Amino acid sequence: NLLSSLLKKEVVYNFRENDILNGGQGAPLAPIFHNLLINQNQIERPACVLNVGGIANITLVVSKNNEDLISFDVGPGNCLLDEWVRRHTQMKYDENGKASNIGKTSEVILNQAIDNFDNISNQKKLSFDIKDFDLSFVKGLSYEDGLSTLVDFTAVIIYQSILKSIKIRENEKLLIIVCGGGRKNLSLMGSIRKRLPKNISLKIIDDYKIDGDFIESQAFAYLAIRSALKKVISYPNTTNVEKASIGGI
């Protein structure tokens, strides 16, 4: 391809096609890299990697084996927050969650939105798209109040999904490690953290001296290496693929 010709290097691409051909959804592909990070940093299991990009997704790591990984989308991550900011300001996002901290959440609207989301999520399997969500439910609120309500909505969806999906006893501990751009939204992180029971703790990936801004690029570099070695990159419990599959060209 063009990039390979320009660089005079082998370039691996098209990671998702084989997964889709084998009945998978083509995403997420980062879970095996999440497992690598857990292994390298000797983090106790079970552990949950929460990736907050446009869509929020979870990787549950219960053992060292990639076959045991469980991963799925939980709902909106930054998508609603960023869209609200773009509609009302010249900015692309609410830096550190400053504007949402000024606002006041509408509990009535929040509860209605959560009920509506439950109806949507019951119809989905593993994957969401940004087009699954819209801002209509906060349309009448001020900029700050709308943003605060959206932060709490996003946090509740993430929190509820973790509790529903990861069954742990009261005396068991679970660590949630957050990566993705949403980890920088202090308002969102605070809203998630305050809802978690005492046996579930939340840290960001940077706490482990790993630069969270490069997780995705590092993940695909790792996938490229596995692809070149003809090693599996997706599993039934991560993409809903029919069988463990290699990927990339």
Task: Place the predicted regions along the sequence by residue.
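Short beta-strand-loop/turn "lid" adjacent to the catalytic site in phosphate-handling enzymes
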Residues: 1
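Short, structured coil segments at secondary-structure junctions
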Residues: 6-7, 196-198
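Glycine-rich beta-strand-to-loop/alpha-helix junction loops that act as flexible
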Residues: 52-55, 175-185, 217
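A contiguous, well-structured pocket-lining segment that forms one wall/lid of small-molecule binding clefts
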Residues: 90-174, 185-197
